[in-house]
Regions:
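Short glycine-enriched, charge-decorated loop/helix-capping segments at active-site entrances
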Residues: 36-42, 80-84
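Nucleotide and nucleotide-moiety/phosphate-recognizing core
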Residues: 1-40, 49-63, 70-75, 90-136
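Short, conserved glycine- and acidic-residue-centered signature motifs
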Residues: 45
């Protein structure tokens, strides 16, 4: 994934500082439906994030949307590139809607308040919907 090339060029052209860029991405290190804001850090195996770091530096803001880890390393690629199971639609849709509804806080640079509002509007499921859906395939 080479998203960093395009984002880096646009940031330089429009004179946007990395700290003013927010990247929304899936995160296997967070349970399904969990959400966290973060600034800086490494790529954690994410090729798109690695590309962004190469072209912007690491100091951009990250909205991390948990999709959970499939449990076995060989299942990671199909997990992150695959479609959501129907059982995951409720938490996925609630999380995306909460991210949109809380945007005024993010746009004001209030990342902690944004995270709190997203979590209030879309609490993470108490179980792994993907694991529950495994029997539905």
């Amino acid at each position: 994934n080479e998203s960093g090339r395009a984002v880096g060029e646009a940031a330089r052209f429009f004179k946007v500082a990395p700290a003013d860029i927010v990247v929304f991405h899936d995160e296997i290190d967070l349970a399904p439906g969990r959400f966290r804001m973060k600034t800086g850090g490494g790529a954690a195996g994410q090729n798109g994030i690695r590309s962004l770091i190469a072209h912007l530096g690491a100091d951009f803001r990250r909205a991390r949307l948990g999709i959970g880890h499939p449990g076995q390393p060989q299942l990671v690629m199909p997990h992150v590139l695959g479609d959501f199971h129907k059982a995951e639609y409720p938490w996925r849709d609630a999380l995306l809607n909460a991210c949109a509804d809380a945007l005024p806080f993010l746009m004001a640079g209030q990342d902690e308040r944004y995270q709190g509002e997203v979590l209030r509007l879309a609490p993470a499921p108490k179980f792994s919907p993907r694991q529950a859906a495994q029997g539905d395939d």
